[in-house]
């Protein structure tokens, strides 16, 4: 544990268990000396998502420690998300020694293999037990795990698994603890092993695009580390200035709202974005959550270059782009860019005028009074939130509605959503982790996503993070209402797909000590937000909507948007 702290570990999420007792004791001693921030969690699945939220916000690996057996299996959903989202996560599991393997011993499984397919690297302690390893071997294991989690060997950051067999006796006498802590505190070494930061390298020669010819930049969700974001943002700005290309950005791209050429309502006008010649396309990271954009790219695009932030795996489901994994900042540095500002072309200026007209039109359509619709909620909410307040959007309808309906205000803040595997798993726990690291935050989630991770409320007890949870309660899986599924199976749609649950979310939150309020009409949203943001810990705001009516409303709005004429 001390070795990991020397490398940069600052936070650890600890789950209960006997076999992991020595790890728990070490974490407790280091936390008591101020060297480690310690969170505890009884549900390993929720704990791993909490750690992932912390790591995403902080830009550095957070450890989650569990005992043996099914505890390890419960880590898999968060490990998959960390893998697909390219975020560092350090999973440390206690295991039985080799003598208890494959002989029917209790709580003994092949846990060393459970997480392997989704991990950047898996390491094991000595089969006989951690006690059989020399100190330098333990430190080498820690150093290797830490470097792999942060993107060693030309890979992107991601999860690693340290599986540590522990032999009995597994609980040292109390009098043996203090000498260990004294030894740690007495060490005057600056570092056990200084770790040199890895440099992202490309998997091939640098592909080129011509900024003097027409093109477009499409920015998907940011998949780099927090500390690399500033350089990425500057690189985007430099390319936009020298090329004069418009920008179609996902709210999760973490790009500033005032970037030149940025379209805020592009998802509503893709059919109108026409160019007389095939456009070059600079794609940043994975595609935004828009099937219409995929169709548009297939129909309109010329040469495409896809830049990832160290992710060497193929990331183009359309099969249209040349991929380069060295990161955008390095890509821009590898080719000479004209520093002179290039204006938007006449065609692209028309795109921008239409975008501005759509913004004014949406103000008229998505009014701040009357019953709550989900498009109006996304539009109004983005305007009402304090400047700079970050938002997490659950990976279902909320993230799609924010992309389409929130407009300029929705892009004027940092937005998070864990769409690596596009699941609703761990939604509340992820948001708790983000808020613990960033401070006040808003989570926008659906009812099934919140209920699926209701154990996340446990992280809000006693000094919980300042998290406002805005629950869109539409009686089931509203995302399915927007797909052709209902027409294919109209009679049993609710039972087979929407799956509404009879749970009172306000009462469930209250059972965990979390206060809550219900919002009846959208007029009440400003006062409810003011109350929620004034609370010291987690709070729940429940908004009831009609998923049937909202699905029809979205279709109506999207159809009408095609007739909005651009301003002069």
From Swiss-Prot:
As recorded in UniProt, its EC number(s) are 2.2.1.9
User: Per its record, what are the GO molecular function terms?
Assistant: 2-succinyl-5-enolpyruvyl-6-hydroxy-3-cyclohexene-1-carboxylic-acid synthase activity; magnesium ion binding; manganese ion binding; thiamine pyrophosphate binding
Xref: Pfam families: TPP_enzyme_C (PF02775), TPP_enzyme_M_2 (PF16582), TPP_enzyme_N (PF02776)
Record text on cofactor binding: Binds 1 thiamine pyrophosphate per subunit.
Q: Name one GO biological process term.
A: menaquinone biosynthetic process
**Reported cofactor(s):** Mg(2+); Mn(2+); thiamine diphosphate
- Which CDD domains does the record cross-reference, listed alphabetically? TPP_PYR_MenD (cd07037), TPP_SHCHC_synthase (cd02009)
Pathway linked to the protein: Quinol/quinone metabolism; 1,4-dihydroxy-2-naphthoate biosynthesis; 1,4-dihydroxy-2-naphthoate from chorismate: step 2/7; Cofactor biosynthesis; phylloquinone biosynthesis
InterPro entries in UniProt: MenaQ_synth_MenD (IPR004433), MenD_middle (IPR032264), THDP-binding (IPR029061), Thiamin_PyroP_enz_TPP-bd_dom (IPR012001), TPP_enzyme_TPP-bd (IPR011766)
Instruction: Provide this UniProt record's keywords sorted from A to Z.
Output: Magnesium, Manganese, Metal-binding, Thiamine pyrophosphate, Transferase
Asked if the record carries the keyword Transferase, the reply is yes
Q: Does the keyword Magnesium apply?
A: yes
The subunit field of the Swiss-Prot or TrEMBL record says:
Homodimer.
Record family assignment? Belongs to the TPP enzyme family. MenD subfamily.
Function according to Swiss-Prot or TrEMBL = Catalyzes the thiamine diphosphate-dependent decarboxylation of 2-oxoglutarate and the subsequent addition of the resulting succinic semialdehyde-thiamine pyrophosphate anion to isochorismate to yield 2-succinyl-5-enolpyruvyl-6-hydroxy-3-cyclohexene-1-carboxylate (SEPHCHC).
What PANTHER family does the annotation carry?
2-SUCCINYL-5-ENOLPYRUVYL-6-HYDROXY-3-CYCLOHEXENE-1-CARBOXYLATE SYNTHASE, PROTEIN PHYLLO, CHLOROPLASTIC
Q: What protein name does the entry list?
A: 2-succinyl-5-enolpyruvyl-6-hydroxy-3-cyclohexene-1-carboxylate synthase
Gene that this polypeptide is encoded by? menD
């Amino acid at each position: 544990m001390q070795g990991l702290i020397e490398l940069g570990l600052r936070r650890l999420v600890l789950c209960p268990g006997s076999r992991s007792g020595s790890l728990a004791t070490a974490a407790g001693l280091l936390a008591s000396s101020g060297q480690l921030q310690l969170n505890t969690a009884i549900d390993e699945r929720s704990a791993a998502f909490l750690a992932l939220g912390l790591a995403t916000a902080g830009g550095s690996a957070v450890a989650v420690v569990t005992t043996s057996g099914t505890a390890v299996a419960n880590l898999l959903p968060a490990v998959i998300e960390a893998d697909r989202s390219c975020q560092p996560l350090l999973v440390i599991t206690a295991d039985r020694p080799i003598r208890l393997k494959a002989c029917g011993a209790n709580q003994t499984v092949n846990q060393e293999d459970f997480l392997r397919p989704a991990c950047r690297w898996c390491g094991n302690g000595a089969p006989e037990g951690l006690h059989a390893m020399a100190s330098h071997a333990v430190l080498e294991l820690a150093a290797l795990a830490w470097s792999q989690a942060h993107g060693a060997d030309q890979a992107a950051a991601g999860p690693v698994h340290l599986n540590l067999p522990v032999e009995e006796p597994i609980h040292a006498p109390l009098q043996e603890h203090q000498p260990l802590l004294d030894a740690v505190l007495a060490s005057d070494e600056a570092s056990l092993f200084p770790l040199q930061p890895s440099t992202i390298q490309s998997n091939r020669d640098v592909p080129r695009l011509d900024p003097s010819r027409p093109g477009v930049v499409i920015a998907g969700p940011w998949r780099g580390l927090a500390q690399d974001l500033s350089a990425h943002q500057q690189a985007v700005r430099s390319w936009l200035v020298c090329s004069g290309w418009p920008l179609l950005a996902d709210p999760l791209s973490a790009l500033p709202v005032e970037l030149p050429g940025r379209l805020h309502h592009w998802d509503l006008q893709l059919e109108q974005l026409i160019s007389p010649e095939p456009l070059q396309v600079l794609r940043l990271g994975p595609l935004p959550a828009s099937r219409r954009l995929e169709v548009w790219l297939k129909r309109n695009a010329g040469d495409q270059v896809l830049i990832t932030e160290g992710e060497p795996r193929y990331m183009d489901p359309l099969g249209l782009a040349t991929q380069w994994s060295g990161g955008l900042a390095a890509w821009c540095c590898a080719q000479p860019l004209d520093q002179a500002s290039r204006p938007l072309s006449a065609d692209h200026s028309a795109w921008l005028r239409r975008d501005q007209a759509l913004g004014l039109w949406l103000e008229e359509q998505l009014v701040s009074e009357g019953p709550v619709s989900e498009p109006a909620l996304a539009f109004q909410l983005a305007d009402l939130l304090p400047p700079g307040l970050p938002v997490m959007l659950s990976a279902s309808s909320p993230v799609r509605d924010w992309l389409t309906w929130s407009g300029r205000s929705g892009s004027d803040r940092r937005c998070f959503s864990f769409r690596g595997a596009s699941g609703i798993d761990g939604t509340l726990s992820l948001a708790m982790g983000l808020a613990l690291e960033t401070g006040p935050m808003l989570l926008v989630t659906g009812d099934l996503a919140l209920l699926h991770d209701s154990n996340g409320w446990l992280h809000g007890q006693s000094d919980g993070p300042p998290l406002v949870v805005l629950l869109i309660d539409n009686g089931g899986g509203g995302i399915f209402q927007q797909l052709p599924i209902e027409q294919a199976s109209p009679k049993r749609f609710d039972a087979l797909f929407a799956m509404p649950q009879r749970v009172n979310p306000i009462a469930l939150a209250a059972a965990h000590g979390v206060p809550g309020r219900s919002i009846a009409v959208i007029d009440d949203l400003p006062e409810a937000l003011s109350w929620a943001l004034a609370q010291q810990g987690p709070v729940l705001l429940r908004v009831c909507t009609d998923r049937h009516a909202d699905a029809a409303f979205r279709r109506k709005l999207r159809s009408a948007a095609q007739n909005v004429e651009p301003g002069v």
